Amino acid sequence: MPVPPPPPPPLPPPPPPLGAPPPPPPPGPPISTDAPSLRKSDLKGRSALLADIQQGTRLRKVTQINDRSAPQIESSKGTSKEGGAAGSNARGGSTPPALGDLFAGGFPVLRPAGQRDVAGGKTGQGPGSRAPSPRLPTKAISGPLPAPASPRLGNASDTHSSARPVPPRPSVPAPPPPTTPPPPPPPPPPPPPPPLPPASPIKAPSVSPPVPPTKGNPSAVPAPIPCVPPLPPPPPTPPPLPPASALSEKAVRPQLAPLHLPPIPPPLPLLPPYGYPALHSEPSSPAQDVREPPAPPPPPPPPPPPPPPPLPTYASCSPRAAVAPPPPPLPGSSNSGSETPPPLPPKSPSFQTQKALPTPPGAPGPQIILQKKRRGPGAGGGKLNPPPAPPARSPTTELSSKTQQPGGQLRNGGQHVIDDFESKFTFHSMEDFPPPDEYKPGQKIYPSKVPRSRTPGSWLQAEAAGQSSDDIKTRNSQLSLKALR
């Protein structure tokens, strides 16, 4: 390292011949005035460097200069011997060289990305202005004779060096355009993402359409209709079906009101219509499961009161219904009980399994959920009117869907936060539970009741007194009985 210091002294003289080109840049003249002016010029140079660096890959040349910047540190040391010039070089030269080393190490490689131009420009300014100075001596070392250059000459050399980098930069801008084009490529990537969203909607419809054909394969819609015609009221009920389906898609709450109104005159039609919206709503998308759950619970309450008279008619139609729409027959079978033959419930699950197989993977989940919803609410609705009824139905529901209950209940619990527990789950009647243990009054001593005494043996005395006191026992027993009741 001691060898490089000698070459720096010749550096100041060569710049004068090169002074002709530098004059065009404005920063040159102010630099020669004073040290503060040097700082201002440095700021201006930084702005220019930032603009130039943003334009293109100028730092690649800087990398070459930065490789030679190591001697520049010694040059600052050597000039320090000279005098005033040392201050200017030491201020700017002490920090930038390290940055120059860092730039030489990794920054130029990262530059091409075009993202760090601004950050690199701020830090790279110092090395950029300082680095060219070594290059000048290398070119004009032939004239090292005037080695004893005054500090002003050194300043002039700095001015020329700072101005010198500017000419090479104009030559460099040619490469910058290639770097600027890369930014345009990034914009094209954003357009590809938009196509993706369209693809997702396409996927959603693709999932939904296959479901309806599967539903259409079994003659679910036509079969129950013949069962309904015999009744006089059914004609008014079919019109509500389409609005119900539309409402189920839009908002379930409005649907509940129309369902409650029509069911009173024709209880039977309510079940098939109630099944239809479910079928229509299922194909729409599994995402609507959240909306569907609230709909089923309210309708079930109306069916329980009328079931006895209409059940036989519905039972007569139940064979077709059981084959066509699986969900409606299940509640019908559970309600009819002895009226319908036992094999019907097994048929419905078998058909459900067949139906679940053709449907896409997303469909079977909602079907199971809907089935559970209809069963659970039916049992809950029955429980609302007569408490003893639910226990009779609960075993049927449990037998018909042992495997489906746990998952369905969990899913319903996650989805129905608004509904009551009775609509979600099947509960046992009070008779099913064993009676609570009889209350047997015993000796109870409460410290608050005991007379306060500062003697240490007060507790023992209190216990003895409590055992003999019957009034406290009777009070405690009465209070506890009231609390239990």
UniProtKB/Swiss-Prot annotation:
Induction conditions: By aldosterone, corticosterone and RU28362 in hippocampus. By corticosterone and RU28362 in cortex. The response to corticosterone is slow. Does not respond to vibratory stress. May be regulated by both the mineralocorticoid receptor and glucocorticoid receptor.
Modified residues (Asymmetric dimethylarginine): R46
Residues in WH2 domain copies: 45-62
Keywords annotated in UniProt: Actin-binding, Cytoplasm, Developmental protein, Differentiation, Methylation, Phosphoprotein, Spermatogenesis
InterPro entries assigned: WASH1, WH2_dom
GO cellular component terms, semicolon-separated: cytosol; early endosome; recycling endosome; synapse; WASH complex
Function summary: May have a role in spermatogenesis. May be a regulator of cytoskeletal organization.
Ranges for region Disordered: 1-485
Organism: Rattus norvegicus (Rat)
Chief location category: cytoplasm
Biased composition (Polar residues): 63-78, 396-407, 475-485
Organism classification: Eukaryota, Metazoa, Chordata, Craniata, Vertebrata
Alphabetical GO biological process terms: Arp2/3 complex-mediated actin nucleation; cell differentiation; endocytic recycling; exocytosis; retrograde transport, endosome to Golgi; spermatogenesis
GO MF, one example: gamma-tubulin binding
Protein name: WAS/WASL-interacting protein family member 3
Residues modified as Phosphoserine: S150, S208, S394
TM region positions: none
Comment field (misc): Suppress the growth and endocytosis defect of yeast lacking VRP1 without correcting the actin patch polarization defect.
PANTHER family in alphabetical order: CXYORF1, WAS_WASL-INTERACTING PROTEIN FAMILY MEMBER 3
Pro residues bias (residue ranges): 1-30, 165-200, 207-243, 260-275, 293-312
Protein's cellular compartments: Cytoplasm
Assembly, per entry: Isoform 1 interacts with WASL (via WH1 domain), and monomeric and filamentous actin.
The UniProt record lists the keyword Transmembrane helix: no
Motif annotated as WASP-binding motif, chain positions: 426-450
Tissue expression from the record: Detected mainly in brain and at lower levels in heart and lung (at protein level). Also detected in testis but not in kidney, liver or spleen.
